[in-house]
Amino acid sequence: ILIKILSHFKIDFSVLHDIDSPKTSAGDRVNSAYSINKTISDTVTEARKAGLNVTYRCSCPNFEIHHQMELPSKDKPFRSWKAVQEQGNVRSSIETVLKELISVCNDIPSNDGTNYEDTLKNWIVLNHKQDEPCYKF
């Protein structure tokens, strides 16, 4: 809804979200978080067609893994903050995506969020996750 409001008022914007896995961890149901990707991608495409500059990035498969943070399920916000403070590679990775999100660029790069499915499929292969039920399409 926020993307549609920004588009209506002709306000350029940036989007960052997790791609997530196509299925739930057991692989027996569609992951609703993954299903939203297409809606976001289509809405961003519409905004661009309307002449807006939209920077669109995705964390594959999620923010923590994308930025090489190993976090427990408990205390994630604090542990994330601590990782950024203490681990240079994590801080650098996050700074890079934040700089992309605030930059003005009319070209659409290969890491654009509209390529989320290909990005995830490549990640699955590179990380040998093909046999995990949640990554089955």
Task: Show where each model-derived region lies.
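Acidic, divalent-metal-binding catalytic cores of TOPRIM
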Residues: 1-137
